[in-house]
Amino acid sequence: MQIADARARCAQLEHLNIFITMTDETGPGEVVAVKDLIDVRGTPTSAGSTVLPMDPKAEDAPLIDTLRGSGCVMIGKTNMDEWALGSTSNNPHYGIVRNPSDLSRIAGGSSGGSAAAVAAGICDWSIGTDTGGSVRIPAALCGVVGFKPTLDTIDTTGVLPLSFSLDTVGSLASDVRTATRGVALMAGKEGWEPASAPALGDLRLAVPGGWVTGLDETVGAVWMTVASQLQLPEIPFPPLSELAKGCLDLMSAEAAAYHRRWISECPERYGPHALARLRGMYAVAGADYVDAVAGRDPLRAAVAEAMDGYDAVLVPTTAAVAPLIQGRINSEPLTRFTRAFNYTGQPVFSLPIKTSGLPVGIQVVGRIGRDAELAAIALALEQVWSGGRAKH
């Protein structure tokens, strides 16, 4: 994609509210959209908020500097949930990011602008961050690929935090190879992009026992087709609620600590949702935070043991399709299946499934540090599903 063509398309789709700021960069390289938590030289970093000064950054975050070394061109900074505190990208300061699949519905969050940029064809790929599902949720709702690599794969220096124990930089793209290449470029890894896919029959895939319940009609129908097609066995697995609680307790305590001074000095600069969310996070007891820290390694070990003999586990990315912008939005079905894998730190792809209606995403979850192997598995599933065999 040429940067001039990308800018022209962006101008045509201004009503989607995808970007907060644009760059004036030129060049022949891959066009990349960057979530506005990440420092890009010459642009401010807002975190989707009005708390911070809007002064242009003098330096790139290291991951952006690495991308420039590969010839990438940054088109702009994408809209998001304020301070990444949400799963809708309905931003009170910079506008609601609209889902390119249906303009009356949310794009998901918190990396909604990054997902919408890919879905709308404005960039070659985009960068998001994922602390409790913020790459995978909008990827699923917008019908694109989202890749959250193993925790700490990509340097988060120059990335504003939500939770230092959980924050993970990831990629969004229209296909597995591009999403994998994006993460590999940011991480300075070689050999990650799969040259070929393994035979589907050679893969050992499963679903965590007792996890997948309460799906809406569209997601439920797609999941039944996928589980039947792949003949997924249910395997014993640590409880979803226990893993998700560990993630939420870490996130809440660390976010509350980071925002404590601003909440005290300038609460009026926060939107109502972010302010209420942060104030609620102060309710996490110190004992719960200590338990979440202490329990993380044992639960990681339990998950690794449960996956022994399997290449990956699959679960829906969200329990529901993209909600309507108007009306009350229940975030629980959007975050139900994602937070667990931030707590464990495992690599995860969200792969889109074509339906006759709104997009649906399926998570493909691998082992810690085996991101390249997971990319090959995701490619195999993408090739099957893009051929229509998993359509509902």
Description of each model-found segment:
Residues V34, M74-N79, I127-T129, E234-I235, ...:
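General beta-strand structural signal in soluble alpha/beta enzymes
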Residues V31-A33, I75, R204-P208:
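Short, well-ordered beta-strand segments
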Residues T50-A58, G95-S110, G327:
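Short pre-catalytic strand/loop immediately N-terminal to key active-site residues, enriched for Gly-Thr
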Residues Q2, D65, A120-W125, T129-P208, ...:
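Structural helix-boundary/capping segments
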Residues M1-T26, L185-T335, Y343, Q383-H392:
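Amidase signature
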